[in-house]
Amino acid sequence: MKEIWDPKKIATSITREIQALAVLFQVCLFLFGGILGICLLLILLLNEYTRILAVLYIGWAFILNSRTPSRGGYPQALQIVRRWNMWRYYCDYFPIQSVKTTDLDPKDNYIFCYHPHGIMGLGAQGNFCGEATGFSEKFPGIYPHLLTLSMNFNVPFIREYTLSAGVCSVDKGSIEYILTKMGPGHSVIIVVGGAAEALEARPGSVKLTLKERKGFIKLALSNG
């Protein structure tokens, strides 16, 4: 007679569902986060009881802290999203792993290049927006800053979520600030193919878009 109720199978099934929900959460943010953020801000502005909060948020986020994405992002104490347990389930879904091949001197600053971009850069998020793959344990004293397009910081509320994951702007000034002004160990991760490479994403095919994207090499040389 077959065992109908198997605790191990049930636990595995529940864990797998949680993993799928973690990935779905990130995918939904990518697809609908911009619309949701704008709609939420409009709702707050139109409501007389929350209007002042919306105005204060706009002033704080887009005036007082408008340069934060290009100035190293949030300090580590405010990088709340990086500490979420969600990233463990997110990475286990695929699974996503990081493999250490050498030690890195924490006295230096580094430019890491990530490939492939894929459609949404899911691997980069899993490795560098949280600690699920053990980056800080493998490279103590190295502080990773995943970089993305500056336009992604124009979306209300999603902007704060992104900054709380330790993400910064990928513009030249931002990279130079992190490498030269934030101290030893602060390093950047550039998805070198960018949005152009995302358009080349196909199942079973990995293409590197690099020919017209060599600015990071110049930055590496100029910052020694």
Residues covered by each model-derived region:
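Short, isolated positions within intrinsically disordered regulatory regions of eukaryotic proteins
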Residues: K9, L64, R88-C91
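Interhelical loop segments of eukaryotic multi-pass membrane proteins
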Residues: L53-V55, P69-I80
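A residue-identity detector for tryptophan
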Residues: W5, W60, W84-W87
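Soluble catalytic domains of membrane acyltransferases
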Residues: L78, R82-N85, Y89-G224
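Short secondary-structure boundary segments
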Residues: W60-G73, E176-K181
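Short, charged cytosolic
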Residues: M1-K8
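FNR-like FAD-binding dehydrogenase module
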Residues: T12, P69, D105-P106
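Alpha-helical bilayer-embedded segments of polytopic membrane proteins, i.e.
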Residues: K8-F62
